[in-house]
């Protein structure tokens, strides 16, 4: 399966992507230069046609900022983001407009992402009216109803408002809005974290079904490692704005190489109570460093159980193969 993915067309190519924010503290004198918060600091990867890339990491590691930088909701500081060979970071507004019909986003809070003053029919139809203004009202209505059926919503609910729906239904509305233009890539920014567990499974299964039917590529961001394993072809592990491990889901989950990934995977619950009782969880010592003042060299070295003197001097880079790559001076990716 993964060998087949590698042979497919590259949709998205990201090289050394950086997103930095200038931070000015209240007690800082005006002549002092602002401090820099490094939210994303040098992520490189490729996304292939029809692939699902899972992105995991603890809160504050830069997952959502990374996703928003791809679609232009956050301005990138440096690096390259190429969509079908076109550099997105240097695009003008009219060129971006064309690309955005191919790249859509599903947000974390389903209700907050919907306009409370608009009916769900108007919400789902808004991208159509923006990109296809010549469509008749009946054509727009027909397409909206067809998309509602596709995501599991009854068309006779078209004139209702977001507050009349449950969280899972609101997320389906958000999915319908993202898919109405038939994009090639959907960025899912923790789309199930605000939902009940039973509803999470329904939304994940719906995304997989729509991916098969429409040939979508997905970037799926989540905290729940079990959900990411279920839906992903490859998994990217982020820590403090850096990519520390990237590989197929079976390699990352069953043969993690980076110490941070090993700690994450050791915390995944096991259904068997006997195995769960005897499982050893690898605890990380210390606090997550500040992205304003990250450690020198390897950013994980202050919490790493195998760090050496060289880890403070040299910053590791992601090395390895398509199946498995790791960013660690102490680990051989081969």
UniProtKB/Swiss-Prot annotation:
SMART domains linked to this entry: AAA (SM00382)
Record's subcellular location: Cell inner membrane
Induction of the gene: Part of the opp operon, which is constitutively expressed.
Membrane topology reported for the UniProt record: Peripheral membrane protein
Major localization listed first in the record, in broad terms: membrane
Signal peptide annotation: none
ABC transporter domain location: 12-265
Entry EC no(s): 7.4.2.6
Any Gene Ontology biological process: peptide transport
Disulfide bond entries: none
Pfam families: ABC_tran, oligo_HPY
Binding residues annotated for ATP, in chain numbering: 57-64
PROSITE patterns referenced in this protein's UniProt entry, alphabetically: ABC_TRANSPORTER_1 (PS00211), ABC_TRANSPORTER_2 (PS50893)
GO molecular function, one term: ATP hydrolysis activity
Gene3D superfamilies recorded: P-loop containing nucleotide triphosphate hydrolases (3.40.50.300)
Alphabetical UniProt keywords: ATP-binding, Cell inner membrane, Cell membrane, Membrane, Nucleotide-binding, Peptide transport, Protein transport, Translocase, Transport
Catalysed reactions, as listed in the record: a [peptide](out) + ATP + H2O = a [peptide](in) + ADP + phosphate + H(+); L-alanyl-gamma-D-glutamyl-meso-2,6-diaminopimelate(out) + ATP + H2O = L-alanyl-gamma-D-glutamyl-meso-2,6-diaminopimelate(in) + ADP + phosphate + H(+)
One Gene Ontology term, aspect cellular component: plasma membrane
This protein's record includes keyword ATP-binding: yes
InterPro entries documented for this protein: AAA+_ATPase (IPR003593), ABC_transp_ATP-bind (IPR050319), ABC_transporter-like_ATP-bd (IPR003439), ABC_transporter-like_CS (IPR017871), Oligopep_ABC_C (IPR013563), P-loop_NTPase (IPR027417)
Function: Part of the ABC transporter complex OppABCDF involved in the uptake of oligopeptides, including the cell wall murein tripeptide L-alanyl-gamma-D-glutamyl-meso-diaminopimelate. Probably responsible for energy coupling to the transport system. Plays an important nutritional role and is involved in the recycling of cell wall peptides.
Family: Belongs to the ABC transporter superfamily.
Description of how the protein assembles with itself and partners: The complex is composed of two ATP-binding proteins (OppD and OppF), two transmembrane proteins (OppB and OppC) and a solute-binding protein (OppA).
Protein name, entry field: Oligopeptide transport ATP-binding protein OppF
């Amino acid at each position: 399966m993964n060998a087949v993915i590698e042979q497919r067309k590259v949709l998205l190519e990201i090289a050394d992507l950086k997103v930095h924010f200038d931070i000015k503290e209240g007690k800082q004198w005006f002549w002092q230069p602002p401090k820099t918060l490094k939210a994303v600091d040098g992520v490189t990867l490729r996304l292939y046609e029809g692939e699902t890339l899972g992105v995991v990491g603890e809160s504050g590691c830069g997952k959502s900022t990374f996703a928003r930088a791809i679609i232009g909701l956050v301005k990138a500081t440096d690096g390259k983001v190429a969509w079908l060979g076109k550099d997105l970071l240097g695009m003008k507004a009219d060129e971006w407009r064309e690309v955005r019909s191919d790249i859509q986003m599903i947000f974390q809070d389903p209700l907050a992402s919907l306009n409370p003053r608009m009916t769900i029919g108007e919400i789902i139809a808004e991208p159509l009216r923006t990109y296809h203004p010549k469509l008749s009202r009946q054509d727009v209505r027909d397409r909206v109803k067809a998309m509602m059926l596709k995501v599991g919503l009854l068309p006779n609910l078209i004139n209702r408002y977001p507050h009349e729906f449950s969280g899972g239904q609101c997320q389906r509305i958000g999915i319908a809005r993202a898919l109405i233009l038939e994009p090639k890539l959907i960025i899912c920014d923790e789309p199930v974290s605000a939902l009940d567990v039973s509803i999470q499974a329904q939304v994940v299964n719906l995304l997989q079904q729509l991916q098969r039917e429409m040939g979508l590529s997905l970037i799926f961001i989540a905290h729940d490692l079990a959900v990411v394993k279920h839906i992903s072809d490859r998994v990217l592990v982020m820590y403090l704005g850096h990519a520390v491990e990237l590989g197929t889901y079976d390699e990352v989950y069953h043969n993690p190489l980076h110490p941070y990934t090993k700690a994450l995977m050791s915390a995944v619950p096991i259904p068997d109570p006997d195995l769960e009782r005897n499982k050893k969880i690898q605890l990380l010592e210390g606090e997550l460093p500040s992205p304003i003042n990250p450690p020198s060299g390897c950013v994980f070295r202050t919490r790493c159980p195998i760090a050496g003197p060289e880890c403070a001097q040299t910053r590791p880079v992601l090395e390895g193969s398509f199946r498995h790559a790791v960013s660690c001076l102490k680990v051989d990716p081969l």
